[in-house]
């Protein structure tokens, strides 16, 4: 997520709704009353109405140490500055141009990015603001820590009815010896960049005065119209290699193809593949429906070519949306023109190679589905973009978009009644603060209710190699009752080596547990491949059970591991190394706040709740 850019898009909240605030018409403010009005709203200093004074104010503010955090500065400046423009009765185009010029002036991004990111989110955010009750200040506070007044949009709570009658809790099943197992490939966050150019700047933040460029390893020497830019004659600090770069760069196509060739030759006995979302590159300012359709079609053909006869089960990612994360539910006014039905239709067409028509019908409605990859095992692909904080359509009505959690409960209840076990694959881990609080907390309760039925859960989105434990806070011992596998990304974005995971799962016989028996993570050192000018060598990074000396993969074992990470510096250092796939040297091993962040992320089974971490003390 390129947060500074998205915040600029959010700046459109005020930029293009002119006289709308909190869903009611706002009376224009006279120029002579402007300073008194802005100071009354708690601003340290009023922004003078004339446009060029605003830009000088912004430049001064940027150079003050306390305002180095660009996300907050640009969000709050957009709020105050645009309010001043509104007071001058500026047109929508003038206001949009102000934001584009602001982005250009301070070198926040490439010129075409500055323009496109604002117009990409314009219609969605304007539409939502006109129908919501949140002020711009609440929105700034919601998305940026210590900025604005509130995080209310992200922490709105609502409840879904969960059936009672929970069966007695079963202990985590023990996998018997000498029973059949099967192999599953887990890919996530592939993010292929078809505009990756060898030799371009991989460390492009150095070309930005504020270090905010979000997408490197591309040719920015000319703009989208072919005119030369101010980067045309700049020296290259870190040239992009042919096999990808562990910087803010997505994956070159040939590295993706290298991974597919390696996996298909090495693992000829895959039973199926799970992909937990995100095929598109991180250039969200250039997303179009046609480009998404083309990319998804190409990706489907690749898997059909390299893995013929192997089912592929996919969950939708936030980067599949156009704009990014934009997936309006059916309750949204003007759904016919704003809904993602075009995307869901594409997915149903592509996925028809691997899932039956009954499941495709559900895909076309809510981009979720249920299939049976093995007898007695139901696999549920769950659309968690309905909990994304950047799916702005949800701020009109956050309550269970497209009744997806209600549908999930029905599927789980049906499986409980039949004695089936369930795997859930999805994109956004519900414990991540990217997931809205109301959705996350309801999902947490669903997992607790159906903990006997849900055998495993698999996620992506973060790009990191990590895990997440669910704790029963009603239990005096904080019983760990479930956990998430979170797969490392295939993309190198950002500061990572590409990776994938192979699971060996107990199953294929009567009474199987359908839990993971072993998990092995593989990666490629792209820096080494570039230096040798040879195709990457895909090698075993680690065997999870062996590396962490785990007796099993029960929630208790994962909880025990997280406790050891808190107390054992050597183990924690190793965890961080694997987290970044042997690339990033994070020097936070003895820093309390840094270690707290890593370990608390493990222990948070639901978003916006650090009560799970209150025992982590110095």
Swiss-Prot record:
SUPFAM superfamilies: Metallo-dependent phosphatases, Saposin
Location in or out of the cell: Secreted
Catalytic activity field: a sphingomyelin + H2O = phosphocholine + an N-acylsphing-4-enine + H(+); an N-acyl-15-methylhexadecasphing-4-enine-1-phosphocholine + H2O = an N-acyl-15-methylhexadecasphing-4-enine + phosphocholine + H(+)
Free-text cofactor note: Binds 2 Zn(2+) per subunit.
Any Pfam family: SapB_1
GO biological process: ceramide biosynthetic process; sphingomyelin catabolic process
Enzyme Commission number(s): 3.1.4.12
Signal peptide per UniProt: 1-22
InterPro entries on file: ASM_C (IPR045473), ASMase/PPN1_MPP (IPR041805), Calcineurin-like_PHP_ApaH (IPR004843), Metallo-depent_PP-like (IPR029052), SapB_1 (IPR007856), Saposin-like (IPR011001), SaposinB_dom (IPR008139), Sphingomy_PDE (IPR011160)
Co-factor(s): Zn(2+)
Pathway annotation from the record: Lipid metabolism; sphingolipid metabolism
GO cellular component annotations of the record: extracellular region; extracellular space; lysosome; membrane
Keywords recorded for this protein, A-Z: Disulfide bond, Glycoprotein, Glycosidase, Hydrolase, Lipid metabolism, Metal-binding, Secreted, Signal, Sphingolipid metabolism, Zinc
Enzyme class, UniProt record, top EC level: hydrolase
Binding site for Zn(2+) 1: 189, 191, 278, 463
Disulfide bridge positions per record: 72-147, 75-140, 103-114, 204-216, 217-249, 387-435, 588-594, 600-613
Domain of life: Eukaryota
CDD domains the record matches: MPP_ASMase
PROSITE patterns: SAP_B
Keyword Secreted: yes
Positions bearing carbohydrate: 89, 159, 298, 525, 568
GO molecular function, one term: sphingomyelin phosphodiesterase activity
Family affiliation: Belongs to the acid sphingomyelinase family.
Function: Sphingomyelin phosphodiesterase (sphingomyelinase) that converts sphingomyelin (N-acyl-sphingoid-1-phosphocholine) to ceramide (N-acyl-sphingoid base) and phosphocholine at acidic pH. Displays its enzymatic activity when secreted. May play distinct roles in signaling.
Any further remark recorded for this protein: Requires Zn(2+) to be fully active. There are two types of sphingomyelinases: asm (acid), and nsm (neutral). Only acid sphingomyelinases have been found in worms.
Protein name per the record: Sphingomyelin phosphodiesterase 2
Organism the protein comes from: Caenorhabditis elegans
Gene this chain is encoded by: asm-2
């Amino acid at each position: 997520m390129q947060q500074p850019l998205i915040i600029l898009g959010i700046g459109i909240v005020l930029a293009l709704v002119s006289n709308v605030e909190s869903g009611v018409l706002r009376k224009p403010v006279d120029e002579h009353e402007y300073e008194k009005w802005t100071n009354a709203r708690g601003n340290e200093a009023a922004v003078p109405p004339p446009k060029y004074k605003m830009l000088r104010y912004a430049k001064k503010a940027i150079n003050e140490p306390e305002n180095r955090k660009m996300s907050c500065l640009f969000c709050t400046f957009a709020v105050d500055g645009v309010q001043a423009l509104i007071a001058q009765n500026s047109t929508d185009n003038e206001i949009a141009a102000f934001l584009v010029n602001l982005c250009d002036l301070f070198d926040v991004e490439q010129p075409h990015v500055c323009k496109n990111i604002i117009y990409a989110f314009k219609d969605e955010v304007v539409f939502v603001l006109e129908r919501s009750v949140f002020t711009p200040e609440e929105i700034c506070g919601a998305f940026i820590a210590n900025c604005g007044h509130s995080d209310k949009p992200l922490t709105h709570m609502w409840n879904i009815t969960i059936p009672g009658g929970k069966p007695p809790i079963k202990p985590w099943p023990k996998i018997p010896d000498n029973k059949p197992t099967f192999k599953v490939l887990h890919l996530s966050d592939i993010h292929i960049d078809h505009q990756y150019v060898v030799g371009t700047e991989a460390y492009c933040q150095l070309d930005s005065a504020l270090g905010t460029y979000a997408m490197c390893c591309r040719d920015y020497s000319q703009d989208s119209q072919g005119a030369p830019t101010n980067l045309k004659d700049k020296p290259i600090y870190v040239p992009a290699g042919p096999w990808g770069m562990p910087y803010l760069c997505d994956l070159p196509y040939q590295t993706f193809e290298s991974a597919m060739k390696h996996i298909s030759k090495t693992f000829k006995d895959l039973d199926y593949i799970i992909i937990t979302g995100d095929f598109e590159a991180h250039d969200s300012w250039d997303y179009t429906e046609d480009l998404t359709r083309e990319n998804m079609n190409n990706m489907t053909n690749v898997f059909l070519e390299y893995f013929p006869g192997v089912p592929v089960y996919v969950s939708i990612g936030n980067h599949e949306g156009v704009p990014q994360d934009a997936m309006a539910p059916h309750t949204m006014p003007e759904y016919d023109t704003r809904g993602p039905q075009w995307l869901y239709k594409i997915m149903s067409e592509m996925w028809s190679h691997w899932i039956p028509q009954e499941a495709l019908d559900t895909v076309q409605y809510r981009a979720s589905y249920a299939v049976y990859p093995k007898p007695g095992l139901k696999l549920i692909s769950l659309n968690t973009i309905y909990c994304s904080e950047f799916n702005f359509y949800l701020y009109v009505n956050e309550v269970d978009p497209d009744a997806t959690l209600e549908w999930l409960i029905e599927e789980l209840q049906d499986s409980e009644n039949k004695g089936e076990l369930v795997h859930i694959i999805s994109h956004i881990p519900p414990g991540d603060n990217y997931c809205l609080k109301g959705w996350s907390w309801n999902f947490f309760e669903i997992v607790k209710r159906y903990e006997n039925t849900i055998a495993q859960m698999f996620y992506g989105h973060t790009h990191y190699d990590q895990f997440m434990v669910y704790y029963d806070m009603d239990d005096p011992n904080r019983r760990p009752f479930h956990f998430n596998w979170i797969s490392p990304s295939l993309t190198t974005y950002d500061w990572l080596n590409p990776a994938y995971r192979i699971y060996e799962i107990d199953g294929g016989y009567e009474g199987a547990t359908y839990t993971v028996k072993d998990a092995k993570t593989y990666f490629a050192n792209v820096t080494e491949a570039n230096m040798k000018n040879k195709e990457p060598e895909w090698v075993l990074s680690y065997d999870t059970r062996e590396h962490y000396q785990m007796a099993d993969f029960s929630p208790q074992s994962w909880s025990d591991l997280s406790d050891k990470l808190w107390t054992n510096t050597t183990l924690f250092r190793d965890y961080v190394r694997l987290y970044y796939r042997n690339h990033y040297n994070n020097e936070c091993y003895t820093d309390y706040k840094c270690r707290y962040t890593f370990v608390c992320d493990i222990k948070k089974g639901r978003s916006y709740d650090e009560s799970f971490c209150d025992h982590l003390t110095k």
